[in-house]
Amino acid sequence: IRTFSVPGDVAFVNEFVRLAELMPPDGLIIDVRDNGGGLIWAGERLLQTLTPKTIEPERLQFINTALTDQLAKANGAGASIDLSKWRPSISRAGETGASFSCSFPITDPARCNDIGQRYHGPVVLITNARCYSTTDIFAAGFQDHDIGEVLGIDNNTGAGGANVWEHGLLLQLAGAPLKALPKNAGMRVAIRRTLRVGKQAGTELEDLGVVPDVEHKMTRRDLLENNVDLIEKAASILAGQPRFRLDATASKAGSKLRVKLTTQNIDRVDFEIDSRPQRSDDIADGSRNVDLPTGLAHGTLSLKGYK
């Protein structure tokens, strides 16, 4: 993934899903080296497609200053960028002495879990020190949710995991005392810092970055033969991970909904239609048909597998 700088997240995530579903089920290597970032929710929404776990997006917070207080007060509900969740804690800073506001996600948690897992094989993520911004956040979420091993060719990512705003946007949202820069100059600032979730909940991503689980020093063969040793290292990591499979096709059988399942290394499958539980089956590896009750042949079917 060379960039997360995309016009919108929907087409980006859909294309990732399309490509991931074409990949062999034995393992997937995702390479985000040199990815400078982009749209935060484009990165965070990808995570759900790689794991059965519920994704908790990373949280962000403002430093408490008179200007961020002004910014939050001027951009409440209905504004192009709604800062109402951050406003109370920023406003209390004079009383509490807190240096930073409370933290909240930018990406809607519901949107981080609205697609579900689409690739069921093991995954390894390759990073380097030139991963910044959304890529820092993506790598942190990958590690925080134990999706797979992070393989780094450096001992950290770029550690620039912050929400970056252009000066022009700040001028639009905050107004005075900011002024337009001379000679059409521009600049960007880190407006909100990111905090991690999971086992490292509350740890700053900015400056600390994402330390890889496994480090690989690039070799002469990597440089001359298209990363051959790096890929071999990633493949060896994948080879040690368990394989899971949950494939399903649905069709009507009279008034019933017939689901053909093919599973591997899964002990139980729960069936839901429009988020309503329908049944739970203990299963063995292989294929089988499951008929859901009469009258439930309409709606969105969701399957959840458990080990």
Question: What feature does the model see in each segment?
Answer:
Residues 1-307:
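C-terminal "post-core" interaction segments
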